[in-house]
Amino acid sequence: MVENKSLGMKIFRVVNTLLMLLMGAICFLPMWHVLMASISDPILLQQNHSLLLWPLGPATEKGYLLVSMNPNILSSYANTLFYVVVGTLLSAFGTLTIGYVLSRRSFRYRNVLMVMITITMLFKAGMVPLFLVVKSLKLLDTRWAVLLPSLLSVFNITIMRTAIEQLPESLMESAKIDGAGDVTILTRIVFPLVKTTFAVIVLFYAVSKWNEWFNAMLFLQNRKLFPLQLVLREILIINSDANAAGAEVAGGLDNYKELTKYATIIVATVPILCIYPFAQKYFVSGVMIGAVKG
């Protein structure tokens, strides 16, 4: 293959490289600023109003110590792991099975069901009706109140359905001729061929459930069931609600308000940042396979 060395191509590569570097900096610098701020001297940090490339003063872990002083942090971490693991498994399984059903042209009501599902994405009933439904099902103050309302995503179902629709119909027909049922076709033929898209959907659900706090705030009163994000939210606003985490922590956060704010952001973000590099390779191919109909 002959490499194109024309002036126009060279200019394009230079501009493209500069744009990529700029986009990388836009994504990287905010998190770097937060990390540096979380280990900076609290007094100097309160006086700073510029981007940080290194810590202000001697590096300190006081912000993280103040966050860890909250007795609910460990239990909230365990709760969040439960919500992420169980919720992601249920959501991914439901998305795969529903996507398979809606992709079958032999299923008479697939278009009707798809319209009904899509309507739920476009029109929301609202917070009060949702609360009343959860209450009528006696799910208030239970883990299911956090898991069930956000169990499935119409967007993810659409991606999975489209990915399965692109598979050759002859594969499923030949399997049926050999006596395979829908469960066998889904698990042994369809799933191995759409596992890249499935991996992306799993990551979408995991990130969404890791960051979930609103349903917990709306449906939970038992602090032992609170997810991490809700506890961290309380830490951030503890100056206006001193009873949220206890007087000892509140006093510390009064003196280290900015430092603790940045430390909580890092605590909530690092787990997802650690997982992303291992799943990044699935993103482009998985989403494109499920989003573009061939």
Language-model regions, residue ranges each:
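A hydrophobic, multi-pass inner-membrane permease signature
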Residues: V2-G294
